Amino acid sequence: MFLKIIVPIVIKRGLMCMENGRIRIADIAEELGLSTATVSNVIHGKTKKISDETVKRVQELLEKRQYIPNMAGILLAQNDSKIIGVVINDHEKYEGHTLEDQFISASVNALAKEMEKADKFLMLKVTGKWSEIPKFASMWNMEGMVLIGFCEQDYKKLREQMHIPFVVYDGYMESSGNLVNIEVNHFDGGVQAGHYLKSRGHKDVLCISDNNICMDLERFMGLKSEIPRAELMVIPMAQEVRTIFYREHLEEIKKYSAVFAVSDYYAMDFIQFLKSVGVSVPTDMSVIGFDNVRECEKFVPPLTTIKQDYNERAAMALQMLKQLKDGECGGKNILLPVTLIERDTVNDVKLHKKCN
């Protein structure tokens, strides 16, 4: 239940008037004997035509009365609004829980920290509709925007509609004009996973993904470059359907000694399924993930995975937005490195054979 409490206080001239518990510019102006325009100009930093003494009087009373400005109005009225929009694709695979996804939450958290450092304001939107993005940007007079989770071959229409700088995470398009594409090296992540599995004697490796395009395809192709016999299994996005799918294909899955999941979420979900059918990880089957979300360390057993640096990408995104705004860059494709993090979900097949 929401309760709105209104406390009207009317006091004689020289004291404060409050409506709804909020101090107004008009109240400050009345107490000082100034115009509301003068007080407003001081609040907005437009003090060139105002005496230092008046500025000081206004600022002191604002502080004394604990005046809280309407920041939204101030920011929207400025050319440099300091508002950075972050748009997340509301993909069906998230099943209505987009912001609960570990990769998404880690990415947003890293961006929030970088924006705090840069004195920017983060405004978040979750949508699956392209048409909502330009509308969102113009409605809030944004300084720039970061798009996450979209895998489209052609951003041309969006570029034409967007008149602000924007950065795309894993955009898979030709960068030009007012945008920069920041990717992690998905192919090399697959290469590192494949090389690691091969060094431990694995030859029959299965890659699981809910699609065979964009970054997931690159991760699989990297794996296959190291292990030519590797196969791709496209799995259902919905968890309940996916569990049924695993059960129906269990005998086929058991033919492989290791599984490379294109995300930590799918890796951990798969391991939970294996546990439910009596398959032990890593004794009976090895598993590698991708992303290195926080839960990897706490998972049982701790998950071996390919790490991408969320903080590095967020810092790069803010840096590129600034450069785009200053006209210093445009049309860039930036590739960030990934690293294999060894934990406890991969068995050494060669060592196991020697012991037997």
Feature locations, PLM:
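Short acidic/polar active-site loop segments enriched in Thr and Asp
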Residues: S35, K82, E143, H202-D204, ...
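Flexible loop/turn connectors
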Residues: R247-N356
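Short beta-strand elements in bilobed, periplasmic/extracellular small-molecule ligand-binding domains
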Residues: L111-V126, D204-C207, L223-T243
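N-terminal helix-turn-helix DNA-binding module of bacterial transcription factors
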Residues: F2-D80
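An alpha-beta-alpha
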Residues: V191-E231, K332-T345
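Hydrophobic alpha-helical segments within soluble ligand-binding/sensing domains
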Residues: V180-C207, V241-E248, A267, I306-D326
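Alpha-helical recognition/docking segments in bacterial nutrient-uptake
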Residues: M1-N20, N79, I83-H195, H249-K255, ...
